[in-house]
């Protein structure tokens, strides 16, 4: 059965999700069709931003507008809505939408996201950490916990999708007692281009000119997908002046002494086995631009593994836009199978 999808919010993640879907469809992977999008931006601008992208380049499909309310991509027609009144006012029922990808960043609370269900959708996937969802899913870590009964599902954050596979492999093999993480993260739209007012005073400073320390909920969110690690991890983010391509550094106290070779071996086994497609193992001296458009959630850098007795430092890269968007496509596919 083809899963019919509506996208609420056609910004960076909404457009990256659609591009990732097209990429997977070219390989015959995703049986998913986007039938409608909702965004208050005018449709000509949405079509332009889909066609041209400063990171991903030009979309290899013709993009045009038809009758001002339909975006045509190749031979696919997508109804473009501009409903401002919230999820419950959207005409999902009229378009036969099965799954909504909620990517506005505004309706991350389950009580608000529930409006999509009231509007006729069967399931809602929030493309961010959510408040009180039925379940938070990180592929490769707890996707087996989805049983079809959950209606509001969070795809967690891009950083949690990178960190969780890292923590899982380390914990399953060696036992994490406690740990601290830092994500060196590309700037995002919740920062200022130039110095200006912001609720987070560090993020008030110019994103392209500064390394900006700020908070991340990724470490604490690990407890949502790995309850055995609840309260054992914490950390923060350093936003840096690049548009995408981030890296997570996890330092953990383990339950036993280990060696660099032992750690690298278990990560290589996981990347080639149960976490294939989610976790990638690299031994080359890569930098951030090398992982842009890599669809993996977590790209383990074996050359950066460090150990002192029972304390270990492990590092994984991630394209915070493209990797995350590919997991959104995967999650839509997983949820669609339960319909």
Curated annotation (Swiss-Prot):
Q: Which GO terms describe its cellular component?
A: cytoplasm
User: Pathway it acts in?
Assistant: Carbohydrate degradation; glycolysis; pyruvate from D-glyceraldehyde 3-phosphate: step 1/5
Q: Where in the cell is it found?
A: Cytoplasm
Residues the entry annotates as binding NAD(+): 12-13, 39, 84, 127, 320
Which pairs are disulfide-linked?
none
List, alphabetically, the InterPro entries matched: GlycerAld/Erythrose_P_DH, GlycerAld_3-P_DH_AS, GlycerAld_3-P_DH_cat, GlycerAld_3-P_DH_NAD(P)-bd, Glyceraldehyde-3-P_DH_1, NAD(P)-bd_dom_sf
Which segment of the chain is annotated as a signal peptide?
A: none
Record keywords: Cytoplasm, Glycolysis, NAD, Nucleotide-binding, Oxidoreductase
Q: Which GO terms describe its molecular function?
A: glyceraldehyde-3-phosphate dehydrogenase (NAD+) (phosphorylating) activity; NAD binding; NADP binding
A biological-process GO annotation: glucose metabolic process
Keyword Amino-acid biosynthesis on entry: no
Q: Which residues form the active site?
A: 158
Q: Which reaction does it catalyse?
A: D-glyceraldehyde 3-phosphate + phosphate + NAD(+) = (2R)-3-phospho-glyceroyl phosphate + NADH + H(+)
Q: Any idea of its EC number? A: 1.2.1.12
* Stated role: Catalyzes the oxidative phosphorylation of glyceraldehyde 3-phosphate (G3P) to 1,3-bisphosphoglycerate (BPG) using the cofactor NAD. The first reaction step involves the formation of a hemiacetal intermediate between G3P and a cysteine residue, and this hemiacetal intermediate is then oxidized to a thioester, with concomitant reduction of NAD to NADH. The reduced NADH is then exchanged with the second NAD, and the thioester is attacked by a nucleophilic inorganic phosphate to produce BPG.
Q: Which family does it belong to?
A: Belongs to the glyceraldehyde-3-phosphate dehydrogenase family.
Q: Which PANTHER family match?
A: GLYCERALDEHYDE-3-PHOSPHATE DEHYDROGENASE 2
Its protein name is Glyceraldehyde-3-phosphate dehydrogenase
């Amino acid at each position: 059965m083809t899963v019919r999808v509506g996208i609420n919010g056609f910004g960076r993640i909404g457009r990256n999700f659609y591009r990732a879907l097209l990429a997977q469809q070219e390989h015959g992977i995703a049986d998913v069709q986007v039938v409608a999008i909702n965004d208050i931006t005018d449709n000509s601008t949405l079509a332009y931003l889909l066609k041209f992208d400063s990171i991903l380049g030009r979309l290899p499909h013709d993009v045009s507008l038809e009758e001002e309310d339909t975006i045509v991509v190749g031979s696919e027609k997508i109804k473009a809505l501009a409903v401002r009144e919230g999820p419950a006012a959207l005409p999902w029922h009229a378009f036969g939408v099965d799954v909504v990808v909620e990517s506005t960043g505004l309706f991350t609370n389950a009580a608000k996201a529930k409006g999509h269900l009231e509007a006729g959708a069967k399931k809602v996937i929030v493309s961010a950490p959510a408040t009180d969802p039925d379940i938070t899913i990180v592929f490769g870590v707890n996707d087996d916990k989805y049983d079809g009964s959950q209606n509001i599902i969070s795809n967690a954050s891009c950083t949690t999708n990178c960190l969780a596979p890292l923590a899982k492999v380390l914990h399953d093999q060696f036992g994490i007692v406690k740990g601290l993480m830092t994500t060196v993260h590309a700037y995002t739209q919740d920062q200022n281009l130039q110095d200006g007012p912001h609720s987070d005073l560090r993020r008030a400073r110019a994103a392209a000119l500064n390394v900006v320390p700020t908070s991340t909920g990724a470490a604490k969110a690990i407890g949502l997908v790995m309850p055995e690690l609840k309260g054992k991890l914490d950390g923060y983010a350093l936003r840096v002046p690049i548009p995408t391509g981030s890296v997570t550094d996890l330092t953990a106290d383990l339950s036993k002494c280990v060696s660099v070779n032992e750690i690298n071996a278990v990560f290589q086994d996981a990347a080639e086995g149960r976490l294939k497609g989610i976790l990638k193992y690299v031994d080359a001296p890569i930098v951030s631009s090398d992982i842009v458009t890599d669809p993996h959630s977590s790209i383990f850098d074996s050359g950066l593994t460090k150990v002192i007795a029972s304390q270990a430092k492990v590092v994984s890269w991630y394209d915070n836009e493209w990797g995350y968007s590919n997991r959104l496509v995967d999650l839509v596919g997983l949820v669609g199978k339960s319909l």
